[in-house]
C-alpha cells in the first residue's frame, strides 16, 4: 500500500518535498539528503506526518 509522505528539512523545519512510499517494504521513517531552497544547500530531510 503506497502512502503520501512529506519530507521536512532537519535544519530549518521547512516541508519542501512530497513523495510516496510503500509502507510494507519501508515501515520506518525515510531520511534523504535533499536540496533546501531556504538554506541554499543540501541538508538531511526526514519523513513527517
Swiss-Prot record:
SUPFAM superfamilies: Zn-binding ribosomal proteins. Keywords: Ribonucleoprotein, Ribosomal protein. It comes from the Bacteria. One of its GO terms (biological process) is translation. GO terms for cellular component: cytoplasm; ribonucleoprotein complex; ribosome. GO terms for molecular function: structural constituent of ribosome. Transmembrane segments: none annotated. Pfam families: Ribosomal_L33. HAMAP family: Ribosomal_bL33. NCBIfam families: PRK00504.1, PRK00595.1, rpmG_bact. Belongs to the bacterial ribosomal protein bL33 family. This is Large ribosomal subunit protein bL33B. It comes from Staphylococcus epidermidis (strain ATCC 35984 / DSM 28319 / BCRC 17069 / CCUG 31568 / BM 3577 / RP62A). The gene is rpmG2.
Amino acid at each position: 500500500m503506497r502512502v503520501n509522505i512529506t519530507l521536512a528539512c532537519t535544519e530549518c523545519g521547512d516541508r519542501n518535498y512530497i513523495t510516496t512510499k510503500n509502507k510494507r517494504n519501508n515501515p520506518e521513517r525515510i531520511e534523504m539528503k535533499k536540496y533546501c531552497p531556504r538554506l541554499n544547500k543540501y541538508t538531511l530531510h526526514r519523513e513527517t506526518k
